[in-house]
UniProtKB/Swiss-Prot annotation:
This is Beta-glucosyl-HMC-alpha-glucosyl-transferase. It comes from the Viruses. Pathway: Genetic information processing; DNA modification. It comes from Enterobacteria phage T6 (Bacteriophage T6). Keywords: Glycosyltransferase, Transferase. It holds the Pfam family TAGT. Transfers a gentiobiosyl-group on a hydroxymethylcytosine residue in DNA. Is involved in a DNA modification process to protects the phage genome against its own nucleases and the host restriction endonuclease system.
Amino acid sequence: MIQFVIPSYQRVGAVSALDMFPTDYEPHIVVREHEEKAYNDAYGSRAKIITIPDGVNGIAGTRKAITDMYAGQRIWMIDDDTTIRMSSMRKRDDRRCVDKVNQLTHEQFYELIQYVEDAMDCGYYHGHARLPIFKITSSWGNYRENSYGFTNTWYDLGKLTTEQIGYGKIDLCEDMYAFLNLINQGYPHLALFKYLVVSGKAQAPGGCSSIRSNSKHNRALEQINREFPEQARWKTSNIEKRKSLGEEDEPLKVLRMCVSRKEKSEAFHKFNAIHPIAVD
């Protein structure tokens, strides 16, 4: 069964991701050694607390450590302020909406697990449930291949290695790097719309916010653009509205993903035969 893994740093009292799990499922929270007692006291009855050395560097280093520790397993890494919910189509404007009120029921949670297990069996060794920032219409279907997203990612670590994923090769925006890195090795990515996520406020205290600034973020994006220039392209319009990340030491840059989705993978055809892409 898929193991949910929640990396967390300086967020004792704010791990809202735990709200999505039924009582008979044990998620793991990965923390620095010096925070083990505080997290155990707060969440030890609801999750297993896993430690990594205090010297592990940032979220990219944390994710690399997680992919090392869980080698051979199927995992779903999810931000500590993120929960996965059901979605439904709103007919009046043909918009897919996330259920912001109700968590998954016991049955729905295990249906989600099976849905993604099926995706992995079909060849989707990495994927995510979408954060609905932009409008998702019925024409998008229940999922889309090679569409980028963040806040959560699943990996079949029986099929992918830490080196293949590429965490630790870039300090920030590591999810974007891993997404492109795996696609360019021939591993398609699956973005779910049937299930959407509710996530916490950007730049909340702790976590990545403790190390992120505009300049650090921009240097990471520049590295991604150098390595994947055709798929990670600079966005030049409507970027002035982007909020600053920590210190406003320079204007924030933005990349847009340009990954071809015209030719579907073998994994897509296998998964579509089991779970049709079309909205009911």
